[in-house]
């Protein structure tokens, strides 16, 4: 009924995950287990469980409702497992990695929903080896028209722009359903939680977020499904995107992002769905289907980019198809664009671009291709 966590587990581990860093008393504290309980909050600052300096903590078969934060990890932890939990309808964050040192954490087989400040949030700290798999993660943002920067999964070091000690890398987000809220079944003119995302990576200029895999997820119904700023070496593969409002994917100020083998489809809705890259280098978008993007912006937009490969993409029933602006050293090959909206262009490459190589593409509608933007090649 009061502020703070219902359960606070405080250990003494100050080392890493290496056995050489353990003190004898740490082994006596190892693997604290919280299992088979329900926690209900009755205070605005009531939390569920806090983990501090633990080694091998396991939270399993636990329900947390009506609290502020569900599971709050603080200061330093190692080898944490959160599994088979229900973190539901909390005013804060479901699983909160709060500016801590944490390597090795698994979050799996859990329902994390309706937590209004984010589902799984990693903010600052030094975090490595985060695995999120087999979860249903939904509507972890405001439930009304309040603007937000949170996400169902938020990984954010942008709040410490001058501090290189705070960094996040080595993340796997696999096999989850991640969705809501934007406007799944509401009126077209209303957007719930504008600015929200399913997955948001927010890095910083002095230290990008890096080495992230996003694979095998079902993603839908947020302002931007995946939003990436200042990251490198990110693999986005074999995901199903639908019902965005307005964007499926936005990537800015990033390098070596690979987007491959995905399906992009609004399903029964009319949605824009744009895939947008700005100020990015050496990325690949390939082997994906892009269907019925109802937008004048362009289905796939590159703005101020360099060194891209677009290959094996199928666009059907979209507004404008591929749009390039101030982009250079880019190859577009084996792409097929058909049934583009009347008056829209399959591809637009104006004279702000340079050294663009086209090879083996099939365009069935209008095209705008300035010869001065093209690379010198016999295939042009």
Residue positions per predicted region:
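Extracellular beta-strand-rich solenoid/capping regions of secreted or surface-exposed proteins
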Residues: 1-33, 40-56, 73, 157-162, ...
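Short glycine/acidic-rich loop motifs that flank beta-strands on beta-rich extracellular proteins
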Residues: 2-6, 43-49, 68-74, 91-97, ...
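Consensus "Asn ladder" position of solenoid repeat domains
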Residues: 37, 62, 85, 90, ...
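Right-handed parallel beta-helix
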Residues: 23-115, 144
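Leucine-rich solenoid repeat scaffolds
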Residues: 333-380
């Amino acid at each position: 009924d009061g502020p703070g966590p219902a359960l606070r587990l405080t250990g003494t581990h100050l080392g890493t995950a290496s056995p050489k860093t353990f003190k004898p008393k740490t082994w006596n504290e190892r693997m604290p287990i919280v299992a088979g309980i329900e926690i209900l909050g009755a205070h605005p600052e009531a939390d569920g469980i806090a983990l501090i300096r633990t080694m091998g903590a396991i939270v399993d078969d636990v329900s947390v409702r009506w609290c502020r934060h569900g599971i709050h990890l603080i200061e330093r932890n190692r080898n944490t497992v959160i599994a088979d939990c229900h973190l539901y309808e909390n005013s804060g964050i479901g699983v909160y990695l709060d500016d801590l040192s944490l390597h090795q954490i698994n979050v799996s087989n859990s329902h994390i929903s309706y937590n209004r400040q984010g589902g799984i949030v990693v903010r600052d700290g030094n975090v490595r080896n985060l695995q999120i798999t087999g979860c249903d993660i939904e509507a972890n943002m405001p439930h009304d028209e309040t603007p937000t920067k949170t996400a169902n999964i938020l990984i954010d070091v942008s709040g410490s722009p001058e501090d290189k000690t705070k960094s996040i890398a080595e993340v796997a987000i696999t096999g989850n359903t991640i969705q809501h809220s934007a406007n799944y079944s509401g009126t077209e003119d209303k957007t719930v939680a504008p600015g929200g995302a399913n997955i948001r990576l927010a890095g910083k200029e002095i230290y990008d977020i890096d080495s992230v895999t996003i694979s095998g997820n079902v993603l839908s119904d947020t302002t931007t499904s995946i939003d990436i700023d200042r990251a490198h070496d990110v693999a986005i593969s074999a995901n199903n995107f639908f019902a965005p409002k307005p964007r499926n994917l936005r990537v800015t100020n990033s390098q070596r992002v690979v987007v491959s083998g995905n399906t992009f489809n609004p399903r029964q809705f009319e949605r824009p769905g744009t895939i947008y890259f700005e100020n990015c280098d050496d990325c690949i978008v390939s082997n994906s289907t892009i269907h019925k993007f109802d937008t004048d912006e362009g289905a796939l937009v590159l703005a101020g980019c360099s060194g891209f490969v677009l290959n094996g993409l199928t666009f059907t029933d979209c507004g404008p198809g591929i749009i390039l602006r101030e982009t250079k050293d880019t190859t577009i090959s084996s792409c097929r664009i058909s049934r583009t909206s009347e008056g829209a262009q399959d591809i637009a490459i104006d004279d702000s671009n340079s050294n663009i190589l086209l090879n083996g593409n099939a365009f069935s509608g209008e095209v705008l291709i300035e010869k001065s933007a093209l690379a010198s090649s016999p295939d042009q």
